[in-house]
Amino acid sequence: IAALLFIPFLGGVHLFDWDEINFAECAREMIVSHNYLNVQIDFKPFWEKPPLFIWMQVLSMKAFGINEFAARFPNAVCGIITLLVIFNIGKKLFDERFGLWWVIVYAGSILPHFYFRSGIIDPWFNLLIFIAIWFFVQLNTNTGVISPGKRFLYAALWGSFTGLAILTKGPTALLIIGLVASIAYLPHFLILVIIKKKKKKNPPLFTLRFR
């Protein structure tokens, strides 16, 4: 069903957004130059974006040819994966019915149909950030219940998806995940500060006796 939502008529409209045109051109130049390590425009270094999304477009163009469909196909795949991810997370948080409703509401919105039928970086970046934050939450929830092995797995997955997000759009990923982590730990930090202040105002009785 997700494939029917995002794949048909994917190449029916010319690339029109500045980012769509540039990223597709970067992928085309990678194929022409056989230089898969450096992103370039006009065969000159293009330092604005990391290469992960461009690599996806290269693979797509090698499979489907250099055209609009191939430039946008990676994001259609991203749309399918996104629906599967939110269904499974919804199912884990509540139940299968909640996961299904989450998918229906999300797929019924306008923005996903614009994003997943485009050739821009943001859909993959958003998905990778979302998954990274999910594993961060898993790592820091019920810390006394989950085993050390599972904690290590969650930490490794959190780090891996954060790294993939950085490879997709750069250090912006660190800022977003760092902000989320800061907000998550802020209550704990404030509680510690309050406890320390109370201890300073009200020293233990045994210290008062010996003054």
Predicted regions and their residues:
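Membrane-integral, polyisoprenol-dependent glycosyltransferases
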Residues: 1-197, 202-211
